[in-house]
Amino acid sequence: MKKFWIGSILIAMSLMWGCDREADEVGEAVDDEQEGSTDRETYFLVADQSNNEAHLIDYDGVELFNWDFNGSIGNDINLLSDGSLIVCLKANNAAVTEGGYGGIFRKINADQTLDWEVTYSSPSYTAHHDVEYLSNGNIIFLAWEIRSNDEAAEEGYAGRGLIYPETIVEMNPLTEEIVWKWDVMDHIVQDYDDTRANYGVVADNPNKVDLNYTYSSRDDGDLFHFNGLTVDEEHDLIYVTVNFYSEVWVIDHSTTTEEASSDTGGIYGKGGDLVYRFGNPETYDNVGDVTLDRVHYPNMLESGNLLVYANEKYDSQSEVIEFALNSPYSLVAGQDNEPEVVWSFTDSRMYSSGLSGAERMDNGHTLITEGRDGTLWEVTEDGTIEWLFKTDYSTIWRTYVVYSDDPALEALGL
């Protein structure tokens, strides 16, 4: 871990203060007439993959602040209330280089000095995609861990070659201590190899994961492809979007690491088995409507509902979907366990095969990031498009809403 010293000087030199730059516009409105009821005191924090930067912009596309990370972004950014920013960056010589790989986490202070930097990348694992900063000061993130062909076979994997199963890691970034960990391979069921302990009927085990659901369509080892996580600290639950399963999984975070490797313990009594799952009941041979086809950003709303971006919902057309989630969660074999869809938005012009997400704004509107096109949408509850803005950034991971009363703005000198 690096803390201040030379590293902070280099970061300070490579980062550019937005308030010292000329007010550049970074895109244009697609239709100026579609700006009727937007809150003009709202700003947008854009994770710009195409330029490996982050930008704070307004509705007119004026850039108020810019972070140039002197490295490749990979993928998420978090702006904290004190003006500091946490960013995921790509590690050199990462063991797994699938889309969204990272391996480095950096916290940059409001004055652009480096607070800390940690690496979670080795010949056997690589952090990727997403990170959250918890109220206890820890970070929680996604990571691939490599299993050899022999190790995969021992778990009943029907394919051949290396596989990259998913883990979730909570780390103290100041000490680099791993304080909690969850591993999907502890929660597998498979009906391929009856000599293995995890052999069973997939449909009878809705809280476990069918290891072989994607093997026939994936030859690169990336079987699951987690790409987003959200932590509900009040209820100690983790929500993850599982792209290649077209699902959202819900995992108990109240467990110890030992309990997380089992099927007992924790507030919800399931250990690390899935507390809930939805979006594609075909993954566990169950009944119910399939509502997701590739999915990004599990965004928990204040109401307890969840917003997601369904990338491939229609033929070359995406959809944003809001699910009503009602606890206590229950997964019953042979029963429709899918939640109710309470809101959705789609448009024939909106399509991104990857990346992307949606945020519910204070005025009730929804901000949508069409990631692979670099386009931002603001839509009302009834589907009216209030703002449609094509940025100059060709690839956006996500866009976060920042309000004018956010103390981060003052900390940044804005």
Spans of features found by a protein language model:
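Bacterial Sec-dependent N-terminal signal peptides
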Residues: M1, S8, S14-G36
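Generic detector of low-complexity/intrinsically disordered segments
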Residues: A12-G18, S81, A333
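Histidine-/acidic-rich catalytic cores in large beta-rich domains
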Residues: A23-L414
